[in-house]
Design a protein with these regions (language model features):
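Non-catalytic substrate-recognition and accessory regions of acyl/acetyltransferase enzymes
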Residues: 1-180
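Short, structured coil/loop segments at alpha-helix boundaries
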Residues: 2, 80, 226-230, 260
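Noncatalytic linker/hinge segments flanking ATPase motor cores
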Residues: 59-60, 73, 192-193, 202-208, ...
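Acyl-donor binding region in acyl/amide transferases
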Residues: 148-151, 155-242
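Acidic carboxylate-rich catalytic motifs and surrounding loops in phosphoryl-/glycosyl-chemistry enzymes
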Residues: 213-216, 243-255
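Residue-level detector of conserved catalytic or cofactor/ligand-binding positions
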Residues: 255-263
Length: 263
């Protein structure tokens, strides 16, 4: 019989929502159990799929929250359970399979693209944020303070890549940092820097189509803990040259239209 370490089983509610000092997650665990019960057939298929890939067994056993999107939401609020299953399975595999030449697997070690502008480093890695928004993320770090400034989460959707999240900071002094970043980037605002970087990555990975999630179908992010900070995805994608159909279709040519004088 295989040991539990070498086998994946759907995680228990306590693994996804453990109680913390001063906080109880009883209701969240109840919702989790109900959703799991309603999707028990899908969960059985998912367990079978994961157990065919040893590295995914270890990965999902270490990250209990990576499984939850299967029975809740993943990428697009319109996805039904079948589409979530297909998209999750595909996205867990596609980037590790694309980047087999790396010395360390992308799901273990972030890939650094170096300083895209002085003091700011861009990395590609597996998410440590909300997996329902996608498993893969570009992150912009302020190196002197080792502080995450911006992120862009993306996923494979059929034969395209899909931007599902573009988020900025909400820590003390973040507004000044964004101004500094815009000034250092010769007027290129950080949100658009992330989109332009994603365009380049799309081509580097061999894809010909880059899409953006329409605002009303985007899963709510938790990176910014503020009800007063609203990211206008439709405006970002429109100003990046996107055309709205089912998704925003973005051109892969790099653009300079986002250059502006920081105020």
């Amino acid at each position: 019989m295989e040991s539990r370490e070498n086998q994946y089983c759907w995680p228990k509610a306590e693994a996804v929502y453990p109680d913390r000092p001063g906080r109880s997650y009883v209701l969240k665990r109840l919702r989790y159990r109900l959703r799991a019960f309603l999707h028990r057939g899908l969960i059985a298929q998912f367990e079978q799929f994961i157990n065919q890939h040893p590295f995914l067994v270890k990965l999902l056993n270490e990250h209990a929250d990576y499984s939850y999107p299967l029975v809740y939401r993943f990428l697009d609020k319109r996805f039904n359970s079948k589409k979530r299953f297909q998209a999750i399975c595909e996205n867990l595999l596609f980037l590790p399979e694309k980047l087999t030449a790396l010395s360390a697997p992308i799901y273990k070690t972030p890939l650094s693209f170096g300083e895209v502008i002085p003091d700011f480093e861009m990395t590609l890695s597996m998410t440590t944020h909300q997996p329902m928004e996608g498993y893969w993320v570009l992150e912009l770090w302020h190196k002197p303070r080792n502080e995450l400034v911006y992120l862009l989460t993306f996923a494979k959707l059929d034969e395209a890549l899909l931007i599902s999240v573009v988020q900025g900071p909400n820590f003390e002094g973040s507004k000044e940092m964004v101004k500094q970043l815009t000034k250092t980037g010769h007027g290129l605002r950080p949100a658009y820097l992330m989109v332009e970087t994603m365009k380049a990555l799309t081509k580097a990975l061999g894809f010909k189509t880059l899409l953006g999630i329409p605002q009303k179908y985007q899963n709510k992010s938790r990176f910014i803990q503020s009800s007063h900070y609203v990211v206008d995805y439709d405006a970002i994608f429109a100003e990046s040259g996107g055309q709205l159909k089912d998704y925003w279709a973005l051109p892969l040519e790099l653009s300079l239209i986002h250059i502006s004088e920081p105020t």
